[in-house]
């Protein structure tokens, strides 16, 4: 199954590169999150009634606009296949290179259209506008995108110049009140932020935990485990969106964070008999 998925992306690489050249005039492969077997988004998601002035490379879709990270998950799986199975992945290297190049080229281009500099004051890419999954929209430096780029670049190990310009994962502090004692002052807990900023919430995913899984930046035996656990327990959307139904992966995050009982309960709920 993995090989067929890898080959699917590899087969569509020329289309993804042609999309980028045609719409934006720069290098790199732009894969949309959901696409047809010929490599383009389906017409309904691209948008039948698009404003004339709207960017032709974007889907006119409140959920899917700027959602380009999915290919990076496949790039990482390809790289992990080489590590775990000693597989020859040389044929997929152009896919990995071009997928990474898109983010570097595109966000430099967008920054240069807004102002004189391609990078921020710290020498990092400005990943704006972006999307943290389909949930936090019009993001500046989404944590899911940053974790994806950083992890793939570190595993790939051949693009150190690009790795140096990837911004840090954004963090934030959340006030946590003691429900048993209303007199006690709230405590500030440091958590992973969904992004540096965003304009709206459009779905019910939890991209602030994507640095835990699939990207493994945080976890057992790694630095700042408490920050990731704080995110799981105290981030208001992470708590509100928590579920065992469908594609929800809270059970995986709990396991990666060493929350054994939490993971057990979520797994039991996910594997229980459904209503239909």
What is the role of each PLM region?
Residues 27-94, 98, 104-168:
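The feature captures the catalytic groove of carbohydrate-active enzymes
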Residues 1-15, 26, 62-84, 90, ...:
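Active-site core of glycosidic bond-cleaving carbohydrate-active enzymes
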Residues 1, 13-19, 102-113, 136, ...:
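Secretory-pathway/luminal and periplasmic proteins that interact with or process carbohydrate-rich
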């Amino acid at each position: 199954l993995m090989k067929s998925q890898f080959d699917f992306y590899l087969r569509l690489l020329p289309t993804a590169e042609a999309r980028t050249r045609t719409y934006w005039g720069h290098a790199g492969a732009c894969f949309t999150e959901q696409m047809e077997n010929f490599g383009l988004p389906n017409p309904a998601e691209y948008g039948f009634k698009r404003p004339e002035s709207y960017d032709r490379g974007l889907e006119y879709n409140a959920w899917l606009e700027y959602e380009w990270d999915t290919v990076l998950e496949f790039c990482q799986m390809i790289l992990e296949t080489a590590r775990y199975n000693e597989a020859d992945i040389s044929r997929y290297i152009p896919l990995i290179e071009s997928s990474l190049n898109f983010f570097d080229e595109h966000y430099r281009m967008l920054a240069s259209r807004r102002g004189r500099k391609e990078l921020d004051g710290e020498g990092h890419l400005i990943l704006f506008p972006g999307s943290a999954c389909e949930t936090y929209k019009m993001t500046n430096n989404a944590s899911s995108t940053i974790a994806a780029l950083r992890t793939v670049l570190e595993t790939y190990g051949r693009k150190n110049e690009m790795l140096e310009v990837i911004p840090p994962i954004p963090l934030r502090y959340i006030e946590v009140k003691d429900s048993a004692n209303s007199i006690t002052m709230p405590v500030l807990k440091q958590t992973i932020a969904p992004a540096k900023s965003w304009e709206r919430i459009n779905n019910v995913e939890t991209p602030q935990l994507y640095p835990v899984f699939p990207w493994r930046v945080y976890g057992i035996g790694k630095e700042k485990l408490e920050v990731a656990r704080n995110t799981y327990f105290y981030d208001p959307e992470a708590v509100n969106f928590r579920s065992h139904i469908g594609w929800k992966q809270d059970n995986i995050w709990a396991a990666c964070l060493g929350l054994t009982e939490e993971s057990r309960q979520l797994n039991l709920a996910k594997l229980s008999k459904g209503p239909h």
